[in-house]
UniProtKB/Swiss-Prot annotation:
Protein name in UniProt: Keratin, type I cytoskeletal 25
Misc. comment: There are two types of cytoskeletal and microfibrillar keratin: I (acidic; 40-55 kDa) and II (neutral to basic; 56-70 kDa).
Domain IF rod: 75-390
Alphabetized UniProt keyword annotations: Coiled coil, Cytoplasm, Intermediate filament, Keratin, Phosphoprotein
Gene Ontology terms describing biological process: cytoskeleton organization; hair follicle morphogenesis; intermediate filament organization
Modification Phosphoserine, positions: S438
Main location: cytoplasm
InterPro entries hit by this protein: IF_rod_dom (IPR039008), Keratin_I (IPR002957)
GO molecular function, one term: protein heterodimerization activity
Region (Tail) location: 387-446
PROSITE patterns attached to this UniProt entry: IF_ROD_2
Spans annotated as Coil 1B: 133-224
Gene responsible for this protein: Krt25
The keyword Phosphoprotein is assigned to this record: yes
């Protein structure tokens, strides 16, 4: 919201006279010239104003009076009149200073009420961003909590995977030991198979030898029978010899008994070894079957654990990707919000700078306006009376309105009416309120 002050109309009433106002210009260090009937008058005014106080310094550069001019007659009365007018001028200056101080106080109060610290007036209202910021903070907290839960789940899954890995290593060591035992039993089985093959070969060899002995014995018996059944009769008186038949029969009986004993011993040893080997093979087959079943179950468990591990790794990867994406999105949003805040702060700084510039320009224009009004009033007071009429000029201000001046002739009493219009406008140059202040001063002309 900006404050604009436009000066109203300033009117002066005086009796008609033969004096005229020509070539008057007003400003800091302005010079005015008045030509009257039978008199010459020239005066220069200089004024300045700084800050909130208005100071006016008027210096008369030249004051020339002809014999039939303004100061002809009683010079003492004229000086008294000028002193009275100067006192009135100083009173007006004091009143304007008080009005200026009042305006400064109002401007200060307005800045305290609508200044940058109150989030109103010229300052931007950031209250509509607070819910968005709170929502973003809540989302960040929720995402952080979800991230912490995901990290906790990942740690639990990692610990579970480590536990399963230890179990797998233990089962693998047990499996390797069982395989080593199976390999040892296989070597024992191979040795037993070799021993059985050797025994079978020995049995076959002994069987062939027995068959060969039976065949030789049969041939010898046939030869002896053929020799005994011939027609040759030989009689001789000799000592009785050894009966070969009996001897052969005895040898055959001993040999058969020995072969039968060897066969029985070999068969008994073979049966014993076969029974022990069969029992050991049965036990080994049972252990192998149980080990194979256990190995199958361990493989199934390992596959299940690998599947669970892969699913957990996939979940972890997806959560990490989601976390990265969420962080990127929130970083982008925070960067955008920071950019908006920076832009708004820059706009706020620019608005404050413009406001300060407008304030300084307003003060300067107000000081110039006050100075011009004082010069006009002083000029009117100096040239007032019976010699001439005051004619004020009109001027325009770019930011604070315009003032109109004119003179009217009503009666011998001179009246000065000062009207001030105080307008409050917003940033869109829309007039909100308008206040009118008028100050009327009447004085009897000389």
């Amino acid at each position: 919201m900006s404050l604009r002050l436009s000066s109203g109309s300033r009117r002066s009433y005086a009796r008609p006279s033969t004096g005229s106002l020509r070539g008057a210009s007003f400003g800091a260090g302005n010079a005015c010239g008045v030509a009257g009937i039978g008199s010459g008058f020239s005066c220069a005014f200089g004024g300045s104003s700084t800050g909130g106080n208005t100071g006016v310094a008027n210096s008369c550069a030249g004051f020339t009076v002809n014999e039939g001019g303004l100061l002809s007659g009683n010079e003492k009365v004229t000086m008294q009149n000028l002193n009275d007018r100067l006192a009135s001028y100083l009173d007006n200056v004091q009143a304007l200073q008080e009005a200026n101080a009042d305006l400064e106080q109002k401007i200060k109060g307005w800045y305290e009420k609508f200044g940058p610290g109150s989030c109103r007036g010229l300052d931007h209202d950031y209250s509509r961003y607070f819910p968005i910021i709170d929502d973003l903070k809540n989302q960040i907290i929720t995402s952080t909590t979800s991230n912490a839960n995901a990290v906790l789940q990942i740690d639990n899954a990692r610990l579970t995977a480590d536990d399963f890995r230890l179990k797998y290593e233990n089962e693998l060591a047990l499996h390797q030991s069982v395989e080593a035992d199976v390999n040892g039993l296989r070597r024992v089985l191979d040795e037993i198979t070799l021993c059985r093959t050797d025994l079978e070969i020995q049995y076959e060899t002994l069987s062939e030898e027995l068959t060969y002995l039976k065949k030789n014995h049969k041939e010898e018996m046939q030869a002896l029978q053929c020799a005994a059944g011939g027609n040759v009769n030989v009689e001789m008186n000799a000592a009785p010899g050894v009966d070969l038949t009996v001897l052969l029969n005895n040898m055959r009986a001993e040999y058969e008994a020995l072969a039968e004993q060897n066969r029985r011993d070999a068969e008994a040893w073979f049966q014993e070894k076969s029974a022990s080997l069969q029992q050991q093979i049965t036990e080994d087959v049972g252990a192998t079957t149980s080990a194979r079943n256990e190995l199958t179950e361990m493989k199934r468990t390992l596959q299940t654990l690998e599947i669970e591990l892969q699913s957990l790794l996939a979940t972890k990867h997806s959560l990490e990707c989601s976390l990265t994406e969420t962080e990127g999105n929130y970083c982008t949003q925070l960067a955008q919000i920071q950019a908006q805040i920076s832009a708004l702060e820059e706009q706020l700084h620019q608005v404050r700078t413009e406001t300060e510039g407008q304030k300084l320009e307003y003060e300067q224009l107000l000081n110039v306006k006050a100075h011009l009004e004082k010069e006009i009033e002083t000029y009117c007071l100096l040239i007032g009376g019976d010699e001439g009429a005051c004619k004020s000029s009109s001027y325009k201000s770019k930011d604070y309105g315009s003032g109109n001046a004119g003179n009217q002739i009503k009666d011998p009493v001179k009246a000065i009416v000062v009207k001030k219009v105080l307008e409050e406008v917003d940033q869109r140059s829309k007039i909100l309120t308008t206040r009118l202040h008028s100050l009327e001063e009447k004085s009897q002309s000389n």
